[in-house]
Protein backbone atom coordinates (compact mmCIF):
# COMPACT_ATOMS: atom_id res chain seq x y z
CA UNK A 1 0.00 0.00 0.00
CA UNK A 2 1.14 3.51 -0.79
CA UNK A 3 1.75 5.37 2.47
CA UNK A 4 1.22 9.04 3.20
CA UNK A 5 4.11 11.12 4.51
CA UNK A 6 3.40 11.72 8.23
CA UNK A 7 5.58 14.85 8.35
CA UNK A 8 5.60 18.37 6.94
CA UNK A 9 9.29 19.19 7.28
CA UNK A 10 9.94 18.52 10.96
CA UNK A 11 6.29 18.91 12.02
CA UNK A 12 3.58 16.26 12.26
CA UNK A 13 3.95 12.63 13.32
CA UNK A 14 1.79 10.24 15.34
CA UNK A 15 2.33 10.75 19.08
CA UNK A 16 -0.50 8.69 20.54
CA UNK A 17 -1.01 5.80 22.98
CA UNK A 18 -0.06 2.49 21.33
CA UNK A 19 -3.69 1.38 21.54
CA UNK A 20 -4.68 3.97 18.89
CA UNK A 21 -1.96 3.15 16.34
CA UNK A 22 -3.91 0.30 14.62
CA UNK A 23 -6.98 2.56 14.26
CA UNK A 24 -4.89 5.35 12.70
CA UNK A 25 -3.18 2.89 10.34
CA UNK A 26 -6.55 1.44 9.33
CA UNK A 27 -7.79 4.97 8.60
CA UNK A 28 -4.72 5.77 6.49
CA UNK A 29 -5.07 2.55 4.47
CA UNK A 30 -8.78 3.12 3.86
CA UNK A 31 -8.20 6.73 2.81
CA UNK A 32 -5.47 5.74 0.33
CA UNK A 33 -7.75 3.06 -1.16
CA UNK A 34 -10.71 5.46 -1.34
CA UNK A 35 -8.69 8.07 -3.24
CA UNK A 36 -8.43 5.69 -6.21
CA UNK A 37 -11.95 4.25 -5.94
CA UNK A 38 -14.18 5.87 -8.60
CA UNK A 39 -17.31 4.86 -6.66
CA UNK A 40 -16.18 6.64 -3.48
CA UNK A 41 -15.08 9.74 -5.38
CA UNK A 42 -18.37 9.88 -7.32
CA UNK A 43 -20.45 9.54 -4.14
CA UNK A 44 -18.47 12.27 -2.37
CA UNK A 45 -18.70 14.55 -5.39
CA UNK A 46 -22.46 14.05 -5.60
CA UNK A 47 -22.93 14.81 -1.89
CA UNK A 48 -20.80 17.96 -2.14
CA UNK A 49 -22.82 19.18 -5.12
CA UNK A 50 -26.38 18.03 -4.45
CA UNK A 51 -26.41 18.10 -0.64
CA UNK A 52 -23.79 20.61 0.47
CA UNK A 53 -24.21 23.09 -2.38
CA UNK A 54 -20.79 23.26 -4.06
CA UNK A 55 -19.31 25.13 -5.81
CA UNK A 56 -19.61 28.13 -3.49
CA UNK A 57 -19.45 31.57 -5.14
CA UNK A 58 -16.53 33.99 -5.21
CA UNK A 59 -18.21 37.30 -4.36
CA UNK A 60 -16.75 40.73 -5.14
CA UNK A 61 -17.27 43.21 -2.29
CA UNK A 62 -19.00 46.12 -4.02
CA UNK A 63 -19.14 48.58 -1.14
CA UNK A 64 -16.30 47.79 1.28
CA UNK A 65 -13.72 48.91 -1.26
CA UNK A 66 -15.67 51.73 -2.93
CA UNK A 67 -13.21 54.38 -4.08
CA UNK A 68 -10.28 52.01 -3.52
CA UNK A 69 -7.96 50.44 -6.09
CA UNK A 70 -8.05 47.02 -4.39
CA UNK A 71 -10.51 44.35 -5.49
CA UNK A 72 -11.67 42.28 -2.51
CA UNK A 73 -13.29 38.90 -3.13
CA UNK A 74 -14.90 36.59 -0.57
CA UNK A 75 -14.86 32.81 -1.04
CA UNK A 76 -18.32 32.06 0.28
CA UNK A 77 -17.97 28.95 2.46
CA UNK A 78 -20.64 30.57 4.65
CA UNK A 79 -23.16 29.50 1.99
CA UNK A 80 -22.31 25.80 2.32
CA UNK A 81 -24.98 23.61 3.94
CA UNK A 82 -24.29 23.64 7.67
CA UNK A 83 -23.02 27.22 7.54
CA UNK A 84 -19.25 26.69 7.25
CA UNK A 85 -16.42 24.97 5.41
CA UNK A 86 -16.55 22.10 7.92
CA UNK A 87 -19.12 20.20 5.84
CA UNK A 88 -16.60 19.53 3.03
CA UNK A 89 -14.39 17.17 4.95
CA UNK A 90 -17.02 15.79 7.32
CA UNK A 91 -18.84 14.19 4.39
CA UNK A 92 -15.54 12.66 3.22
CA UNK A 93 -14.63 11.25 6.63
CA UNK A 94 -18.17 9.99 7.32
CA UNK A 95 -18.09 8.04 4.04
CA UNK A 96 -14.69 6.61 5.07
CA UNK A 97 -16.17 5.57 8.44
CA UNK A 98 -18.95 3.67 6.66
CA UNK A 99 -16.40 1.96 4.41
CA UNK A 100 -14.54 0.80 7.55
CA UNK A 101 -17.78 -0.60 9.00
CA UNK A 102 -17.94 1.90 11.88
CA UNK A 103 -21.38 2.61 13.32
CA UNK A 104 -20.61 5.66 15.48
CA UNK A 105 -18.92 8.99 15.03
CA UNK A 106 -17.04 10.86 17.77
CA UNK A 107 -16.32 14.53 17.16
CA UNK A 108 -14.97 17.56 19.02
CA UNK A 109 -16.17 21.08 18.39
CA UNK A 110 -15.36 24.64 19.44
CA UNK A 111 -17.75 27.03 17.72
CA UNK A 112 -20.12 24.15 17.11
CA UNK A 113 -19.71 24.33 13.32
CA UNK A 114 -17.79 21.05 13.10
CA UNK A 115 -20.27 19.47 15.51
CA UNK A 116 -23.18 20.62 13.34
CA UNK A 117 -21.44 19.30 10.22
CA UNK A 118 -20.78 15.94 11.93
CA UNK A 119 -24.41 15.78 13.11
CA UNK A 120 -25.83 16.48 9.66
CA UNK A 121 -23.54 13.94 7.98
CA UNK A 122 -24.50 11.28 10.55
CA UNK A 123 -28.21 12.03 10.13
CA UNK A 124 -27.80 11.69 6.36
CA UNK A 125 -25.69 8.53 6.42
CA UNK A 126 -27.37 6.72 9.33
CA UNK A 127 -24.53 6.91 11.87
CA UNK A 128 -24.71 7.56 15.61
CA UNK A 129 -23.02 10.80 16.66
CA UNK A 130 -21.56 12.10 19.90
CA UNK A 131 -19.91 15.49 20.10
CA UNK A 132 -17.57 16.74 22.83
CA UNK A 133 -17.81 20.48 23.42
CA UNK A 134 -16.25 22.65 26.13
CA UNK A 135 -18.85 23.79 28.66
CA UNK A 136 -17.84 27.44 28.05
CA UNK A 137 -18.39 26.96 24.31
CA UNK A 138 -21.77 25.29 24.92
CA UNK A 139 -22.83 28.53 26.61
CA UNK A 140 -21.50 30.91 23.95
CA UNK A 141 -22.75 28.82 21.01
CA UNK A 142 -26.22 27.75 22.17
CA UNK A 143 -27.85 27.85 18.70
CA UNK A 144 -25.35 25.26 17.43
CA UNK A 145 -25.85 23.03 20.48
CA UNK A 146 -29.58 22.98 19.69
CA UNK A 147 -28.95 22.31 15.99
CA UNK A 148 -26.73 19.31 16.83
CA UNK A 149 -29.32 17.85 19.21
CA UNK A 150 -32.11 18.49 16.72
CA UNK A 151 -30.25 16.34 14.18
CA UNK A 152 -29.87 13.49 16.66
CA UNK A 153 -26.37 14.07 18.03
CA UNK A 154 -25.51 13.64 21.69
CA UNK A 155 -23.66 16.77 22.90
CA UNK A 156 -21.33 16.11 25.84
CA UNK A 157 -20.18 19.27 27.72
CA UNK A 158 -16.55 19.12 28.89
CA UNK A 159 -15.80 20.80 32.22
CA UNK A 160 -12.06 20.07 32.53
CA UNK A 161 -9.25 22.61 31.94
CA UNK A 162 -10.53 25.82 30.37
CA UNK A 163 -13.70 24.01 29.19
CA UNK A 164 -12.97 24.96 25.57
CA UNK A 165 -11.81 23.30 22.33
CA UNK A 166 -8.48 21.94 23.63
CA UNK A 167 -10.31 20.06 26.39
CA UNK A 168 -12.98 18.77 24.00
CA UNK A 169 -10.18 17.38 21.77
CA UNK A 170 -8.62 15.55 24.71
CA UNK A 171 -11.94 14.00 25.77
CA UNK A 172 -12.76 12.91 22.22
CA UNK A 173 -9.36 11.17 21.89
CA UNK A 174 -9.88 9.50 25.27
CA UNK A 175 -13.29 8.21 24.17
CA UNK A 176 -11.86 6.90 20.89
CA UNK A 177 -9.11 5.00 22.71
CA UNK A 178 -11.84 2.87 24.30
CA UNK A 179 -14.24 2.59 21.36
CA UNK A 180 -12.25 2.52 18.11
CA UNK A 181 -13.59 -0.94 17.15
CA UNK A 182 -17.05 0.51 16.53
CA UNK A 183 -16.41 4.28 16.36
CA UNK A 184 -14.52 6.65 14.07
CA UNK A 185 -13.05 9.84 15.51
CA UNK A 186 -14.04 12.48 12.98
CA UNK A 187 -11.41 15.10 13.74
CA UNK A 188 -12.43 18.59 12.65
CA UNK A 189 -9.20 20.25 11.60
CA UNK A 190 -5.76 19.77 10.01
CA UNK A 191 -4.21 19.12 13.44
CA UNK A 192 -3.80 15.96 15.51
CA UNK A 193 -1.92 12.73 14.80
CA UNK A 194 -1.11 11.50 11.29
CA UNK A 195 -3.02 10.84 9.00
CA UNK A 196 -5.63 13.45 10.06
CA UNK A 197 -3.77 16.60 8.90
CA UNK A 198 -3.39 15.13 5.40
CA UNK A 199 -6.89 13.62 5.16
CA UNK A 200 -8.61 16.81 6.28
CA UNK A 201 -6.52 18.91 3.88
CA UNK A 202 -7.35 16.61 0.96
CA UNK A 203 -11.08 16.94 1.66
CA UNK A 204 -10.82 20.74 2.15
CA UNK A 205 -8.59 21.58 -0.82
CA UNK A 206 -11.67 21.92 -3.03
CA UNK A 207 -12.02 25.47 -1.61
CA UNK A 208 -8.77 26.66 -3.19
CA UNK A 209 -9.30 24.67 -6.39
CA UNK A 210 -12.62 26.44 -6.96
CA UNK A 211 -11.31 29.85 -5.88
CA UNK A 212 -8.41 29.64 -8.33
CA UNK A 213 -10.66 28.71 -11.27
CA UNK A 214 -13.18 31.40 -10.31
CA UNK A 215 -10.68 34.24 -9.97
CA UNK A 216 -8.97 33.29 -13.24
CA UNK A 217 -12.36 33.32 -14.97
CA UNK A 218 -13.30 36.71 -13.48
CA UNK A 219 -9.94 38.50 -13.61
CA UNK A 220 -7.73 36.48 -15.95
CA UNK A 221 -4.91 36.55 -13.35
CA UNK A 222 -4.08 34.96 -10.01
CA UNK A 223 -4.82 36.94 -6.83
CA UNK A 224 -2.05 38.89 -5.11
CA UNK A 225 -3.05 37.74 -1.64
CA UNK A 226 -5.13 34.91 -0.17
CA UNK A 227 -6.14 35.45 3.46
CA UNK A 228 -7.77 33.06 5.94
CA UNK A 229 -8.22 32.82 9.70
CA UNK A 230 -6.22 30.15 11.53
CA UNK A 231 -7.28 28.18 14.59
CA UNK A 232 -6.42 24.54 13.92
CA UNK A 233 -6.10 25.67 10.32
CA UNK A 234 -8.40 23.65 8.04
CA UNK A 235 -10.15 26.48 6.20
CA UNK A 236 -6.79 28.17 5.62
CA UNK A 237 -5.08 25.02 4.28
CA UNK A 238 -8.20 24.39 2.20
CA UNK A 239 -7.84 27.69 0.35
CA UNK A 240 -4.01 27.90 0.48
CA UNK A 241 -3.32 24.43 -0.94
CA UNK A 242 -3.91 25.16 -4.61
CA UNK A 243 -1.83 28.36 -4.45
CA UNK A 244 1.22 26.98 -2.59
CA UNK A 245 3.11 26.37 -5.84
CA UNK A 246 2.27 29.86 -7.17
CA UNK A 247 5.04 32.03 -5.66
CA UNK A 248 3.42 35.27 -6.84
CA UNK A 249 0.46 34.65 -4.49
CA UNK A 250 0.99 35.79 -0.89
CA UNK A 251 -0.60 33.41 1.62
CA UNK A 252 -1.60 35.08 4.89
CA UNK A 253 -2.98 33.27 7.94
CA UNK A 254 -4.64 35.35 10.65
CA UNK A 255 -4.47 34.10 14.23
CA UNK A 256 -6.69 35.37 17.07
CA UNK A 257 -4.97 38.23 18.91
CA UNK A 258 -7.68 38.12 21.57
CA UNK A 259 -7.46 41.00 24.02
CA UNK A 260 -3.99 41.93 22.79
CA UNK A 261 -0.71 40.01 22.81
CA UNK A 262 0.57 41.96 25.82
CA UNK A 263 -2.33 40.64 27.97
CA UNK A 264 -1.41 36.99 27.33
CA UNK A 265 -5.08 36.48 26.38
CA UNK A 266 -4.70 35.33 22.77
CA UNK A 267 -4.41 32.25 20.55
CA UNK A 268 -1.25 32.83 18.52
CA UNK A 269 0.86 29.64 18.60
CA UNK A 270 2.58 30.48 15.30
CA UNK A 271 3.51 34.09 15.97
CA UNK A 272 4.09 33.71 19.74
CA UNK A 273 4.50 29.97 20.36
CA UNK A 274 7.23 27.35 20.40
CA UNK A 275 7.74 23.75 19.28
CA UNK A 276 6.27 20.94 21.29
CA UNK A 277 4.08 17.84 21.29
CA UNK A 278 0.35 18.13 21.89
CA UNK A 279 -2.80 16.38 20.65
CA UNK A 280 -0.77 13.62 18.97
CA UNK A 281 1.46 15.86 16.82
CA UNK A 282 4.71 17.82 16.83
CA UNK A 283 3.82 21.42 16.04
CA UNK A 284 3.91 24.97 17.34
CA UNK A 285 1.97 25.70 20.50
CA UNK A 286 1.51 28.09 23.36
CA UNK A 287 3.56 26.80 26.31
CA UNK A 288 4.86 28.10 29.60
CA UNK A 289 8.55 27.87 30.63
CA UNK A 290 7.94 24.35 31.98
CA UNK A 291 6.61 23.12 28.63
CA UNK A 292 3.01 22.97 29.84
CA UNK A 293 0.39 23.93 27.24
CA UNK A 294 -1.02 27.36 28.08
CA UNK A 295 -4.68 28.29 27.82
CA UNK A 296 -5.54 30.10 24.61
CA UNK A 297 -8.21 32.76 24.37
CA UNK A 298 -10.35 34.21 21.58
CA UNK A 299 -13.77 35.80 21.34
CA UNK A 300 -14.40 33.23 18.60
CA UNK A 301 -14.75 29.71 19.97
CA UNK A 302 -13.49 28.15 16.72
CA UNK A 303 -10.10 29.88 17.00
CA UNK A 304 -9.67 29.26 20.72
CA UNK A 305 -6.97 26.58 20.36
CA UNK A 306 -3.40 26.64 21.76
CA UNK A 307 -1.74 24.84 18.84
CA UNK A 308 -1.99 24.67 15.04
CA UNK A 309 -1.87 22.07 12.27
CA UNK A 310 1.66 20.89 11.41
CA UNK A 311 1.49 22.01 7.78
CA UNK A 312 0.92 25.60 8.93
CA UNK A 313 3.94 25.32 11.25
CA UNK A 314 5.95 24.15 8.22
CA UNK A 315 4.63 26.91 5.93
CA UNK A 316 5.56 29.47 8.59
CA UNK A 317 9.05 28.02 9.10
CA UNK A 318 9.79 27.92 5.36
CA UNK A 319 8.36 31.41 4.85
CA UNK A 320 5.86 30.26 2.22
CA UNK A 321 2.99 31.68 4.28
CA UNK A 322 2.98 34.68 6.56
CA UNK A 323 1.08 34.63 9.87
CA UNK A 324 -0.30 37.71 11.58
CA UNK A 325 -3.05 38.32 14.12
CA UNK A 326 -6.24 40.33 14.56
CA UNK A 327 -7.63 41.22 17.99
CA UNK A 328 -11.19 40.64 19.23
CA UNK A 329 -11.99 44.31 18.67
CA UNK A 330 -10.62 44.31 15.12
CA UNK A 331 -12.68 41.20 14.32
CA UNK A 332 -15.81 42.79 15.82
CA UNK A 333 -15.28 45.91 13.69
CA UNK A 334 -14.92 43.78 10.54
CA UNK A 335 -17.99 41.73 11.54
CA UNK A 336 -19.99 44.96 11.81
CA UNK A 337 -18.61 46.52 8.64
CA UNK A 338 -19.29 43.52 6.39
CA UNK A 339 -22.82 43.17 7.78
CA UNK A 340 -23.54 46.87 7.35
CA UNK A 341 -21.97 47.42 3.93
CA UNK A 342 -22.43 44.13 2.09
CA UNK A 343 -25.37 42.48 3.86
CA UNK A 344 -23.23 39.45 4.75
CA UNK A 345 -22.93 38.44 8.42
CA UNK A 346 -19.62 36.56 8.82
CA UNK A 347 -18.60 34.11 11.53
CA UNK A 348 -16.39 35.79 14.14
CA UNK A 349 -13.63 33.40 13.05
CA UNK A 350 -13.80 34.60 9.42
CA UNK A 351 -14.06 38.21 10.61
CA UNK A 352 -10.43 37.92 11.79
CA UNK A 353 -9.29 37.28 8.20
CA UNK A 354 -11.48 40.10 6.92
CA UNK A 355 -10.09 42.46 9.58
CA UNK A 356 -6.55 41.92 8.30
CA UNK A 357 -7.64 42.42 4.68
CA UNK A 358 -9.32 45.73 5.58
CA UNK A 359 -6.18 46.82 7.44
CA UNK A 360 -4.05 46.06 4.37
CA UNK A 361 -6.40 47.99 2.09
CA UNK A 362 -6.41 50.97 4.45
CA UNK A 363 -2.62 51.17 4.73
CA UNK A 364 -1.57 49.94 1.29
CA UNK A 365 -4.32 50.51 -1.25
CA UNK A 366 -3.04 49.65 -4.73
CA UNK A 367 -4.08 47.76 -7.85
CA UNK A 368 -4.35 44.32 -6.25
CA UNK A 369 -6.69 41.36 -5.91
CA UNK A 370 -7.29 39.93 -2.45
CA UNK A 371 -9.32 36.80 -1.69
CA UNK A 372 -10.57 36.30 1.87
CA UNK A 373 -11.90 32.86 2.78
CA UNK A 374 -15.24 33.60 4.42
CA UNK A 375 -15.14 30.27 6.23
CA UNK A 376 -18.53 30.49 7.92
CA UNK A 377 -21.64 32.52 8.59
CA UNK A 378 -22.29 34.50 11.75
CA UNK A 379 -25.73 33.32 12.87
CA UNK A 380 -24.09 31.39 15.72
CA UNK A 381 -22.39 34.57 16.96
CA UNK A 382 -25.24 37.07 16.96
CA UNK A 383 -26.04 36.71 20.68
CA UNK A 384 -22.40 37.17 21.73
CA UNK A 385 -22.01 40.17 19.43
CA UNK A 386 -25.40 41.69 20.32
CA UNK A 387 -24.43 41.75 23.99
CA UNK A 388 -21.09 43.47 23.26
CA UNK A 389 -22.59 45.97 20.80
CA UNK A 390 -25.34 46.82 23.29
CA UNK A 391 -22.78 47.49 26.04
CA UNK A 392 -20.80 49.71 23.67
CA UNK A 393 -23.86 51.52 22.35
CA UNK A 394 -23.09 50.44 18.78
CA UNK A 395 -26.62 49.33 17.89
From Swiss-Prot:
Its pathway, per UniProt, is: Amino-acid biosynthesis; L-tryptophan biosynthesis; L-tryptophan from chorismate: step 5/5
Question: What range does the record give for the signal peptide?
Answer: none
A GO CC annotation recorded here is: cytoplasm
State its Enzyme Commission number(s). Answer: 4.2.1.20
Q: Which Gene Ontology MF annotations are present? A: tryptophan synthase activity
Q: Which residues carry this modification: N6-(pyridoxal phosphate)lysine?
A: 86
- Record's catalysed reaction(s): (1S,2R)-1-C-(indol-3-yl)glycerol 3-phosphate + L-serine = D-glyceraldehyde 3-phosphate + L-tryptophan + H2O
SUPFAM superfamilies under this entry? Tryptophan synthase beta subunit-like PLP-dependent enzymes
**Pfam families according to UniProt:** PALP
Which major enzyme category is it?
lyase
* Ligase as UniProt keyword: no
Q: Keywords for this entry?
A: Amino-acid biosynthesis, Aromatic amino acid biosynthesis, Lyase, Pyridoxal phosphate, Tryptophan biosynthesis
Q: Does the keyword DNA-binding apply?
A: no
Tell me which cofactor or cofactors this protein depends on.
pyridoxal 5'-phosphate
Please name the NCBIfam families in this protein's record: trpB
Quote the function comment for this protein. Answer: The beta subunit is responsible for the synthesis of L-tryptophan from indole and L-serine.
HAMAP family tied to this protein = Trp_synth_beta
Q: Which family does it belong to?
A: Belongs to the TrpB family.
The subunit field of the Swiss-Prot or TrEMBL record says: Tetramer of two alpha and two beta chains.
Question: Could you identify this protein by its name?
Answer: Tryptophan synthase beta chain
Amino acid sequence: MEKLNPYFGQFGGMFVPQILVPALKQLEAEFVRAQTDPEFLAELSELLTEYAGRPTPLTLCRNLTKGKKTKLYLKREDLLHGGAHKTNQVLGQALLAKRMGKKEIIAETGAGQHGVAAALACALLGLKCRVYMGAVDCERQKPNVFRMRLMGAEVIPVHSGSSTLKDACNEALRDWAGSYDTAHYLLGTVAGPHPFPTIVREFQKIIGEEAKQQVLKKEGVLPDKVIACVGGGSNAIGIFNDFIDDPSVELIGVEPGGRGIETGKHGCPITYGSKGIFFGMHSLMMQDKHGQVKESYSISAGLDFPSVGPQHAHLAETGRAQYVYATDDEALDAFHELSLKEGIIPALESAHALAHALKLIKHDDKEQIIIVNLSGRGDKDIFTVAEIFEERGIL
